[in-house]
Amino acid sequence: MTQKLTITRPDDWHLHLRDGAALAAVLPDTARQFARAIVMPNLKPPVTTVAQAQAYRARILAALPAGMQFEPLMTLYLTDNTGPEEIAAARASGFVHGVKLYPAGATTNSDAGVTDIRRCYPALEAMQRAGLPLLVHGEVTDPAIDIFDREAVFIERVMTPLRRDMPELKVVFEHITTKDAAQYVRDASGPVGATITAHHLLYNRNAIFTGGIRPHYYCLPVLKRETHREALVAAATSGSERFFLGTDSAPHARGLKEHACGCAGCYTALHAMELYAEAFDAAGALDKLEAFASFNGPAFYGLPRNTGTLTLEREDWELPAELPYGDTTLVPLRGGETLRWKAR
């Protein structure tokens, strides 16, 4: 049984850092484990221009504690009004690495998102020419579609027609949750990749309802059936370069999770690599973790691998039950429980 594993320093290809005091609270957790992260643009107001991304990047770097090394990889928030000129500026910037598609209303702070993908075709065509990736929250928002089916229907209604029209557009299917999405990415022609979270590798939808409502397991896309979780584990541990690590760590104040209308999102930045190690260990695939966490993402984005390392040791330790979060607290996924791996 492997007791210790040293891997190339990993990156997080899907992260929510928030802003202000919340940013200052959570950024060190990510920087301790990851060299770089794709930073989501769904602030209020959203990051829709290169100038806004540059300002947000400066705030992130200003919040980084002295002595810590971390590179934020910025993204823009795609809207119906995003133009080709903004895409050209993004590609030329050197710090914008993707554009995020949120279907309007699909998740936290997505109200300004896309109402009709066809309205975005001029921007998407510019992205295809520039080689700038489109990062997709792959769920339809049609209220007639069951929440557990929204990813599969998105493939049919949006992803397949989009990639038929733009076969060379680089696309990341973010935080996939179904066997449908895993198979789509595995079988797709052209430049398609996918991020997978630790919580979707470890849990099925029963986790939300065990003994009562468990709000800290509620995220979007929502956890799915066990058959889907198993398909995600198979994809992540397959060795395919198309699948890579994206925590989708999404901090919310405790009072906004434990609430009559609680926010969606799991906070995992503090212990992300421990959770991924647990998932890969359970699958008997620790030897596949380094490629998933450290190699596949840089290869897709055309970036060099990191030069540092991170070591994971089999060691029991208790995760804090809650963490400081501005003037309040947040609860990490599995807060107060014992974890079996420790990252150093």
From Swiss-Prot:
Keywords: Hydrolase, Metal-binding, Pyrimidine biosynthesis, Zinc. Its cofactor is Zn(2+). GO terms for cellular component: cytosol. The modification N6-carboxylysine is found at residue 100. Zn(2+) 2 binds at residues 100, 137, 175. Pathway: Pyrimidine metabolism; UMP biosynthesis via de novo pathway; (S)-dihydroorotate from bicarbonate: step 3/3. It catalyses: (S)-dihydroorotate + H2O = N-carbamoyl-L-aspartate + H(+). The keyword Oxidoreductase does not apply. Its EC number is 3.5.2.3. Binds 2 Zn(2+) ions per subunit. InterPro entries: Amidohydro-rel, DHOdimr, Dihydroorotase_CS, Metal_Hydrolase. Zn(2+) 1 binds at residues 14, 16, 100, 248. GO terms for biological process: 'de novo' pyrimidine nucleobase biosynthetic process; 'de novo' UMP biosynthetic process. Substrate binds at residues 16-18, 42, 137, 220, 252, 264. GO terms for molecular function: dihydroorotase activity; zinc ion binding. Pfam families: Amidohydro_1 (PF01979). The active site is at residue 248. HAMAP family: PyrC_classII. Homodimer. Catalyzes the reversible cyclization of carbamoyl aspartate to dihydroorotate. Belongs to the metallo-dependent hydrolases superfamily. DHOase family. Class II DHOase subfamily. This is Dihydroorotase. The lineage of its organism: Bacteria, Pseudomonadati, Pseudomonadota, Betaproteobacteria, Burkholderiales.
